[in-house]
Amino acid sequence: MSERKLFTSESVSEGHPDKIADQISDAILDAILAEDPEAHVAAETCVYTGSVHVFGEISTTAYIDINRVVRDTIAEIGYTEAEYGFSAESVGVHPSLVEQSGDIAQGVNEALESREGDTDDLSHIGAGDQGLMFGFAINETPELMPLPISLSHQLVRRLAELRKSGEISYLRPDAKSQVTVEYDEHDKPVRVDTVVISTQHDPEATNDQIRQDVIEKVIKAVIPADYLDDDTKFFINPTGRFVIGGPQGDSGLTGRKIIVDTYGGYSRHGGGAFSGKDATKVDRSASYAARYIAKNLVAAGLATKAEVQLAYAIGVAQPVSVRVDTFGTSTVPEAVLEAAVRQVFDLRPAGIIQMLDLKRPIYKQTAAYGHMGRTDIDLPWERLNKVDALVEAVKTVL
């Protein structure tokens, strides 16, 4: 009997409470970076019925209207009706932002290497905190992402498209998806076993109507027919009713969907969240760099899947460790890949910022539907412009 395995990942829509918080935090970050690219930002958001609290630490020369940024973000998501219990113009906005700690700033603004006499400009910035970050890539999809998270993101994005276009008029902003994929004995995806979709809706919509629309206009529009069969299970709004949703149904916080933001649990995670943080925070920038490395390694044919771990000490520019794990799929020893990675990629915070041009206001667009593997927007860590350099570096190491 051949061994078959199941793996499940989930995603949530832009109207999910935690994702509202992420988008507000990144909208604030973008607004600040648009005026002050050198700003240090750590903006956290909490949302609940009728209220938004924004708090954290910011050092900047910019002035932004946080109240307006918050309301505009909520309106763009689709919370514009009072009956939702959370609407752009009536919600209470409560900002409480202070300046970044001087003790932290001194290590970020002047790294240990710089204090010890290193005159390289890229050694000047130290990591904003200690920590470990992972990046991953696999050849299951054209964007080199695991199939379960890729499909999960596409499903909730499709729901949002149908809601905003008015094609399904009874949809409301909050939604979740979950996809279980069956893999064969060679770890290749062969079919979709289960799809779960819960979508907020107007009270007049019937369960039968929702089920039919979601299966025909969402699931079958997203998941290739080859992956669906008579045994595929669909659970559509399995509680039977989802009228109360968004922050009226659950409170939301920045940084509570870190697995949705990355690889759906298929790869390890260092625990740090992304949204609301400028690029001196390696939780964010080094995670992007690790994805950039892993994706280019797989695209170069050096492995069929790759996980890259980076780790840092606060106030120190150079990473304390770089590890490449290819799970036995690499064409050369992993030590060779690690050496090649160190040759090709400057993994000091300032090196990552320069390499990926991370001082720009590009972050709000990442705050829903995943930071990795995006095909709908142009993100620098998704580019395959280091393939040739990696192949050549491997040759020099060998």
Swiss-Prot record:
It is found in: Cytoplasm. Binds 2 divalent ions per subunit. Binds 1 potassium ion per subunit. It is an enzyme of class 2 (transferase). The keyword Metal-binding applies. One of its GO terms (molecular function) is methionine adenosyltransferase activity. Its cofactor is Mg(2+); K(+). The keyword ATP-binding applies. Pathway: Amino-acid biosynthesis; S-adenosyl-L-methionine biosynthesis; S-adenosyl-L-methionine from L-methionine: step 1/1. K(+) binds at residue 44. This is S-adenosylmethionine synthase. It comes from Streptococcus pyogenes serotype M5 (strain Manfredo). The gene is metK.
